[in-house]
């Protein structure tokens, strides 16, 4: 006989990492790749993402929850990448997210989540080998509820991220990329005067959300109008507690996940399309989600090129 359990959820440490885009010629890019827009060129992308799970890890115990059935998170995200120089790019994005379940009576949540901005700088580029320093931050743009999990669309914390990225690209188009990041996260305020975390009872509406870190490796091919890659990612919190037995999750939980995925893009000219699929293969305090995304990209010049004398 199957046991009915309280709800749980999985929220990605960086929701919009699932939504990515590239453009050929001067390829559009993300904060986790070595691709840059050229000076005075930009790329606007709009991506739809669908992520769902019906099993999750309560700490390290993999289980299901018949009270919510299948949990689904969907999002639409516009993103703009702008080339300031050939070695410096600015990226900005804000996703609109909605959550729902196939069972139970929990009210689904929807709204704009967090506005994110990134600076990406290439400080070394020699014989196909390059090093990149990347800094980013995010801030909530709406007053969504952070502790109504698994239905919350985010954690309501401000973040600051530092990342180092290494890339090697062969003249054949084959490339390898690896990066590591550390994510600082602010405290949040919840609409209650007391809560339980770390096996303690806190008489406060201020919650300390643990910092996080991530790492990834990618192997792909990029040449002319075609890009394809396979990747593996790992993300975790730097501390935090666990989902208590038969209890709801909370923003203080130490969420960990190992994800594998594939990505493909086709862009013969300035308009292109891309698609991505990813699956969480292992984790703790997260859902075993499968995610798909598809996007359309438009590359344009936002200023006239300098005239040659």
Where are these regions (language model features)?
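Outer-membrane beta-barrel biogenesis signature
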Residues: 26-61, 68, 302-309
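Residues that define the transmembrane beta-barrel architecture of outer-membrane proteins
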Residues: 40, 72-76, 109-115, 129, ...
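Transmembrane beta-strands of outer-membrane beta-barrel pores
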Residues: 48-54, 94-100, 123, 137-143, ...
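Outer membrane beta-barrel transmembrane domains
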Residues: 57-59, 64-66, 201-309
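Outer-membrane pore/translocation modules
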Residues: 105-207, 252, 267
